C-alpha cells in the first residue's frame, strides 16, 4: 500500500520541491516590490465655497468649482457677511479628480475621509456631543462638456470629536479646533471619468440642525484609490495563479478517486481548501474594467472570509488527524468544539460586513460607526469574533502541543525496530514536524510583513532601486498562501508507488500490504497505518 507522496519522497526530492517553491515565493515578493507601484494613492481636495443665491435650494443645478461653467464662489466665510450670503446659500463643491486629470476603472475603488476646519468663536462654540448634518449630492460624467448625472443624494450625519487646546478667551478667537477625521464615502468601483460632490450644511435653529457646531471655515477631503499600475500587476498574478491551482486541484482529486477506498476527512478538507483558494484566484475583477460593479469590494471580502475559514479549519483537522492516539476522528462532527468558534466568528464578521459595505451599495455615504447604536453593534460583532478567534487559537495551540508530545512519546518505540525501518519512521516524523513548522512560518511571515508595512513609509531605497514594501507585502503574502495550498495538494496526494516495490528484499521488515504512512485516518479498505497500529496498541496498554 502507498501513502501520501510526502511519505514516499526522498529527502533530496523534498528539498528540490521546497527550493522550487522558495524561488516562486521570492519572485512573488519581487514582483510587488520592484515592478508594481504602491497599492494606493491618497489625494487631498480642498472644497470651493460656491454661492446658491436661489430662494428654493433644489438639486436641479450642480455647482462646479472650476472650468468654463464654474460657480459664483467666495474665498472665505467673512466675505459672505457683507454680501448678505446666508449659511444655507453656501455649497461646498469638490471636483474629482483634480484639474487636467481623469479617473479610471483601474483605480477599482474610492474611499474618502473628511476633515472640517472649525474656528473657535466665543459666541459659537462646539457643544458637547455636537453633530454636523450634511446634505450631500454626488454626480458623474464621462465627458468634460457633458451634463452631470446624479449618482447619490443623502443626508449625512457625523458626530464631531473636537478639542481646543488653547484657553477659550477672546484673544484666541479664530484659532482652529483639533478635530478627528470623519469617514465620508466609499464606492466599490470607478466606472466614470469625473465625479462632483456638492455639500451643503443646512441650518435650522428650530429643529437644532447644525446648531452648536462652531464656525466651519473649510471642508477638506482625502481621496484614496488603488493605483492602476498595481491593479494590472495584481490582475496578472490572479490570472497566472488561477490555472495553476485549478490544475493541481483536479490532479489531486483524480489521484484520490483512483484509490480503492473513499476519501478520508483530511483529503476532503485539503480539496476544499484548494476550491476556496481557486475561488479567490478567479480574476472576475477583469469585468470591473468594463462594468460598473460596485459590489466587488463586498464580494472580495466574502471570498477571503471563505478561504480563511477553510484554512483555519484545515489546521485544526490536520493536527487532529495526526494526533496518533486511540481516538478515530475521520468525521467533521468530531471537531465541532474547534470548528464551532470558526463558524461563529466568520458569521459575525459576515454580518458586520453586510451592515457596512452591504448598505454602501445603495448609500455610499453610510458608515455603521457614525451612530451610537451602530458603533455598539459593530463592536459587539467584532468582540464576539475576537473571542472566537482566541478560543480557536487556544484549541489549536493545545492540539499542536499534543501532537508533538505524542510523537516524542512514541519515538521510544523506535529503537526496537531494525535500523532501516527506524530511519524510515524517523524520516516520516521529521517531515510531519517540518510541515508544521512551515505552517507556523507562513503565519508568522504574514504577521511580520503586515507589521512592517504599517510602520514603514511604504518604500525602501537602496541606491537607485526603490522597493515598494506595501506592494511586496500584498503580492508576496498572496503568492505564499497559493504556494502553501499548492504544496499541500501535491505532497499529500496519494502516492501510487508501493513501499514494497521501492525497497529491495523487504529492507523495512514490513509484511505485504502493511502501511508505512503517517496519515492516521485511513481505516477503510486499506486498513490502518503502521504508525497508527503501533501507537494505538501502546495507548490501549
Curated annotation (Swiss-Prot):
Q: Name one GO cellular component term.
A: Golgi membrane
This entry's Gene Ontology molecular function terms read:
identical protein binding; Wnt-protein binding
Record's comment on post-translational modification: N-glycosylated.
Effect annotated for changing residue 392 to C:
In ZKS; results in decreased secretion of WNT3A and WNT5A; decreased activation of WNT signaling
Annotated membrane-spanning segments are 16-36, 233-253, 269-289, 304-324, 332-352, 381-401, 432-452, 472-492
Q: Which disease is it linked to?
A: Zaki syndrome: An autosomal recessive disorder characterized by developmental delay, progressive microcephaly, and short stature, as well as dysmorphic features including sparse scalp hair, cupped ears, wide nose and mouth, short philtrum, and high-arched palate. Other variable features have been observed, including ocular, skeletal, cardiac, and renal anomalies.
Q: What family does the Swiss-Prot or TrEMBL record give for this protein? A: Belongs to the wntless family.
Q: How does it sit in the membrane?
A: Multi-pass membrane protein
State what this protein does: Regulates Wnt proteins sorting and secretion in a feedback regulatory mechanism. This reciprocal interaction plays a key role in the regulation of expression, subcellular location, binding and organelle-specific association of Wnt proteins. Plays also an important role in establishment of the anterior-posterior body axis formation during development.
UniProt subcellular location: Golgi apparatus membrane; Cytoplasmic vesicle membrane; Cell membrane; Endoplasmic reticulum membrane
Q: Source organism's superkingdom?
A: Eukaryota
Q: State the organism of origin.
A: Homo sapiens
Spans annotated as Interaction with Wnt proteins: 101-232
A GO BP entry is: Wnt protein secretion
Could you tell me which residue ranges are on the Lumenal side of the membrane? 37-232, 290-303, 353-380, 453-471
PANTHER family according to UniProt: INTEGRAL MEMBRANE PROTEIN GPR177 (PTHR13449), PROTEIN WNTLESS HOMOLOG (PTHR13449:SF2)
| Name of protein | Protein wntless homolog
Show which residues sit on the Cytoplasmic side of the membrane: 1-15, 254-268, 325-331, 402-431, 493-541
Q: Could you give the subunit structure recorded for this chain?
A: Interacts with WNT3A. Interacts with WNT1, WNT3 and WNT5A.
Question: What keywords does the record list, in alphabetical order?
Answer: Cell membrane, Cytoplasmic vesicle, Developmental protein, Disease variant, Endoplasmic reticulum, Endosome, Glycoprotein, Golgi apparatus, Membrane, Transmembrane, Transmembrane helix, Wnt signaling pathway
Amino acid at each position: 500500500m502507498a501513502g501520501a507522496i510526502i511519505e514516499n519522497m526522498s529527502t533530496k526530492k523534498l528539498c528540490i520541491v521546497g527550493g522550487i517553491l522558495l524561488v516562486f515565493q521570492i519572485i512573488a515578493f519581487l514582483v510587488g516590490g520592484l515592478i508594481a507601484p504602491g497599492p494606493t494613492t491618497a489625494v487631498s481636495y480642498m472644497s470651493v465655497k460656491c454661492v446658491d443665491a436661489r430662494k428654493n435650494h433644489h438639486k436641479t443645478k450642480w455647482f462646479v468649482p472650476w472650468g468654463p461653467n464654474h460657480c459664483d464662489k467666495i474665498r472665505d466665510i467673512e466675505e459672505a457677511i457683507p454680501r448678505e450670503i446666508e449659511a444655507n446659500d453656501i455649497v461646498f463643491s469638490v471636483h474629482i479628480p483634480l484639474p487636467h486629470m481623469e479617473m479610471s476603472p483601474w483605480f477599482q475603488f474610492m474611499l474618502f475621509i473628511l476633515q472640517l476646519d472649525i474656528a473657535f468663536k466665543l459666541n459659537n462654540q462646539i457643544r458637547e456631543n455636537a453633530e454636523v448634518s450634511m446634505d450631500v449630492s454626488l454626480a458623474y460624467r464621462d465627458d468634460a462638456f457633458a451634463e452631470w448625472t446624479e449618482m447619490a443624494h443623502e443626508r449625512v450625519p457625523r458626530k464631531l470629536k473636537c478639542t481646543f487646546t488653547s484657553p477659550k478667551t477672546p484673544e484666541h478667537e479664530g484659532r482652529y479646533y483639533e478635530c478627528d477625521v470623519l469617514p465620508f464615502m466609499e464606492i466599490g468601483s470607478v466606472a466614470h471619468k469625473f465625479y462632483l460632490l456638492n455639500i451643503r450644511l443646512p441650518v435650522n435653529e428650530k429643529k437644532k440642525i447644525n446648531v452648536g457646531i462652531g464656525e466651519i471655515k473649510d471642508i477638506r477631503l482625502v481621496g484614496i484609490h488603488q493605483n492602476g499600475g498595481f491593479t494590472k500587476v495584481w490582475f496578472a498574478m490572479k490570472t497566472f495563479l488561477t490555472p495553476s491551482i485549478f490544475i493541481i486541484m483536479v490532479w489531486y482529486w483524480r489521484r484520490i478517486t483512483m484509490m480503492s477506498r473513499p476519501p478520508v476527512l483530511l483529503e476532503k478538507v485539503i480539496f476544499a481548501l484548494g476550491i476556496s483558494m481557486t475561488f479567490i484566484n478567479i480574476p472576475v475583477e477583469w469585468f470591473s474594467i468594463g462594468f460598473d460593479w460596485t459590489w466587488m469590494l463586498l464580494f472580495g471580502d466574502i471570498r477571503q472570509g471563505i478561504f480563511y475559514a477553510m484554512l483555519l479549519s484545515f489546521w485544526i483537522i490536520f493536527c487532529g488527524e495526526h494526533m496518533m492516539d486511540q481516538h478515530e476522528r475521520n468525521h467533521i462532527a468530531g471537531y465541532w468544539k474547534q470548528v464551532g468558534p470558526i463558524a461563529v466568528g466568520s458569521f459575525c464578521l459576515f454580518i458586520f460586513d453586510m451592515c457596512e459595505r452591504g448598505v454602501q451599495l445603495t448609500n455610499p455615504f453610510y458608515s455603521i460607526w457614525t451612530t451610537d447604536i451602530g458603533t455598539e453593534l459593530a463592536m459587539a460583532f467584532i468582540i464576539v469574533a475576537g473571542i472566537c478567534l482566541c478560543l480557536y487559537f487556544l484549541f489549536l495551540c493545545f492540539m499542536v502541543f499534543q501532537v508533538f508530545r505524542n510523537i516524542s512519546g512514541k519515538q521510544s518505540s523506535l529503537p526496537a525496530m531494525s535500523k532501516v525501518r527506524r530511519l524510515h519512521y524517523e524520516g516520516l516524523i521529521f517531515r510531519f514536524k517540518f510541515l508544521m513548522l512551515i505552517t507556523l512560518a507562513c503565519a508568522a511571515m504574514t504577521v511580520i510583513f503586515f507589521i512592517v508595512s504599517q510602520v514603514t513609509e511604504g518604500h525602501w531605497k537602496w541606491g537607485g532601486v526603490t522597493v515598494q514594501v506595501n506592494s511586496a507585502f500584498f503580492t508576496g503574502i498572496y503568492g505564499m498562501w497559493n504556494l502553501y495550498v499548492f504544496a499541500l495538494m501535491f505532497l499529500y496526494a496519494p502516492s501510487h508507488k508501493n513501499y514494497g516495490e521501492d525497497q529491495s528484499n523487504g529492507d523495512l521488515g514490513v509484511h505485504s500490504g502493511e502501511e508505512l504512512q503517517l496519515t492516521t485516518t485511513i481505516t477503510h479498505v486499506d486498513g490502518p497505518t503502521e504508525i497508527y497500529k503501533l501507537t494505538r496498541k501502546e495507548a490501549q496498554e
